[in-house]
């Protein structure tokens, strides 16, 4: 029976939990943050978001999403034009054309009762900092030119070479600089580029320094990682890793279709969010790695059902719930972001698992997990182009010994479906899903939350990552 394999997998994983995972208040919570990010405007216009749009979106989030738990604002890429620096070479603004810098905007966000996230890589050095030959804070006479590497990220951003004296002080100093500005979330991008050009040992050394300085106060989001050896390096130093390609234009392509079923050994290993969440699901659990399915642009989905599908995937996988829709693009998608019953799962640190990690199987579209009070949450997804019936067996799949649910609740329709025996079944149209909460009768086969299977038993399927 399927449950026997699942139960064995979970029990063994509890005994063999990966002790090398980064231990922080964030990984202990289990799920990613809920926040707004400036990605959509930047992607659509292929340039940095202007200050007036930034302000309007902050105000919109404060009025429409903050009360639902989306309590953080984060800038995004297109960062090359951030060339305004302080005496030690650290950037003081998201963009040099902006009137105001980090101090002003961090206070503006904080005054609205929200936290601040920053998109930046501490291994970067701006062109301005290089040619100013700034003194590296914490060193005796070492300057920026002396720690720059031989390979640049691009014409405006250089890489720091970790083998050079002063590199540690630069990288740790950048993290400390952002922490002192009140930043609680650091989104570190283009990691594959550094590892590719400087090698895995140098890459790991840089991440180690970042994690040491971040401590338990700053959330570390690792973006565009190669995740060689199934994230062995990233697991030790990050709170959250990206598991699939960028959102880009969004839509069903991003959610489920792009390069479906295909795998690469380097970034991006998977082309769509669903495949990535399946493939790395064995790493995720409280005290382990948080999976990042990237940003949601729900306004790009075809209809309400597709919006619910993508949001449900992020919730079931324990991902960050990162809103990229804006005040003038979100439209009817706002109601999806405001589903308090789904949000509560994220609040409780809920992380679900697919019943199989084998891409393309129906079991990989059936996700299950357990809440601290013993209730089960089940997500059934139809990724296909034809209608399908999906079901969950209370005993075989969940281990409910009585085979009885005293109540099943539909979390999207906010409706109690009542008592059910043996199983729950749903007829799902293409690109739709259902998420239910099951209150079992009597004892279940296990009471522990679903744990990571990294370094424990493995699923019957390997996708090669």
Predicted regions and their residues:
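Bacterial Sec-dependent N-terminal signal peptides
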Residues: 1-22
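Mature N-terminal, pre-catalytic/accessory segment of carbohydrate-active enzymes
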Residues: 20-35, 39, 44, 441-448
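Active-site-proximal substrate-binding groove within the catalytic cores of carbohydrate-active enzymes
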Residues: 31-37, 207-411, 423-441
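Aromatic-lined carbohydrate-binding/catalytic grooves of carbohydrate-active enzymes
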Residues: 36, 40-43, 49-50, 54-172, ...
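Short secondary-structure boundary/capping segments
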Residues: 88-92, 133-135, 203-207, 234-241
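Extracytoplasmic, non-cytosolic globular domains
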Residues: 182-186, 190-218, 222-225
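Solvent-exposed beta-strand/loop surfaces of large extracellular or lumenal domains
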Residues: 404-422, 455-464
